[in-house]
């Protein structure tokens, strides 16, 4: 029987150091865009000065409940996705941390429906109080829509056969309601398997990303960070798959260079608004201790003096 895993925060010390810098007890306002179970937030609060502030965001009601146990007056949390961080005052934040993806408590709770390893309701919503579940969406989606989601968000080469198999099963037996049923359908449609990977891995990833609009929220959060970060403020993002990392990498690259307007070739360029600092992968020891760290990539950038 699979046992739920205790959540271990990936790149904990590296991320907090990148966010706060080398100074002792920094002041300023910092943002933890993904509170989760509070691994990063608690360490930030330990190292933050008495005048510092930490604002956390999370869509998950269980994360909000966990955050309620923090009684530190310097801490506050908002029951919102990190796409709302841009609503903070302009140039008011000294650092933004985004730890993307799903936490172990979410993955390992069968009732959340994130994992093919446990049989449970096919939900996958980060915020269970709003929006469609995966089961509800699959009940009405067309074959082409399902294939597009699985292909674009899961980078799954068997997206077409999987989508056809889902619709065929739905037509024959009614709506697909459980993770086990979906995993069984996918396994039957995927003819070759990648070594060490369950055939349902990419499909489950794709549906989770789609149903939670994860990539759109990430793009909004990155844009929002330009608005709220003060000059010298840090942007720290930990991603866990290539789609996320590509967005972060391209965003930092786009804003780390001068931009010329082709329609006005003699106009001065728009100066860069970010300075790329580093890219960090977990150590061999961390990956050995926490298998979920193996795909993590952390990118760090610094806000320049240029106004948003």
Curated annotation (Swiss-Prot):
GO BP terms, alphabetized: rRNA base methylation
Q: Which residues bind S-adenosyl-L-methionine?
A: 38-40, 58, 82, 99, 106
GO annotation, cellular component aspect: cytoplasm
> What are the EC numbers?
2.1.1.199
| Short name of any one Pfam family annotated for the protein | Methyltransf_5
> Where, subcellularly, is it found?
Cytoplasm
What reaction is this protein's catalytic activity? cytidine(1402) in 16S rRNA + S-adenosyl-L-methionine = N(4)-methylcytidine(1402) in 16S rRNA + S-adenosyl-L-homocysteine + H(+)
Q: State one molecular function term (GO).
A: rRNA (cytosine-N4-)-methyltransferase activity
**UniProt KW keywords:** Cytoplasm, Methyltransferase, rRNA processing, S-adenosyl-L-methionine, Transferase
InterPro entries to which the protein is assigned, alphabetical:
RsmH (IPR002903), SAM-dep_MeTrfase_MraW_recog (IPR023397), SAM-dependent_MTases_sf (IPR029063)
Give the family from UniProt. Answer: Belongs to the methyltransferase superfamily. RsmH family.
Annotated function: Specifically methylates the N4 position of cytidine in position 1402 (C1402) of 16S rRNA.
Q: How is this protein named in the record? A: Ribosomal RNA small subunit methyltransferase H
Q: What's the source species for this entry?
A: Acidovorax sp. (strain JS42)
Gene encoding this chain? rsmH
